[in-house]
Amino acid sequence: MSHSQSGIYPFQTAALSRKGIAGIVAIEPGACPEPTADMTPYAGLPILVLWGDYVDEFPRWAPRLKNCRAFVAAANAAGAKAEMLVLPEIGIKGNSHMLMQDDNSLDIADLLIDWIGKHVATAE
């Protein structure tokens, strides 16, 4: 799980080796891999890219959201199990970039726990 500027690191790590990586949860990542990059490392990997509100109000973040959408599409085309979740698009509004500190942070945590439980296999 990563947030903001550390958002790219799980993707870079998975591209080097999938050992020990059961899934990736990136919360408002500062970057996603370029959609033209090699997507084979992500084949079969559960990936959630989560975004809150207000992205369009910040010129530096709107292109990052757009790039992450393109990455999710490219990763899925290569066999990943990637999902883009933009909270306002599912009716959850009012979240800042620091979702873990917002008033509904426990609801967001429950959402993440539920997604992980449904999509990420546990180690035996």
Model-assigned labels for residue ranges:
Residues 6, 56, 98:
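Short, electropositive, low-hydrophobicity segments enriched in small/polar residues
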Residues 8-9, 70, 107, 111:
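Extracytoplasmic/secreted proteins, especially bacterial periplasmic and envelope-associated proteins
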Residues 18-20:
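Conserved S-adenosyl-L-methionine
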Residues 92-94, 98-124:
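Catalytic active-site module of serine/aspartate enzymes centered on a nucleophile-bearing elbow/loop
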Residues 1-6, 10:
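Gly/Ala-rich beta-loop-alpha elbow adjacent to hydrolase catalytic centers
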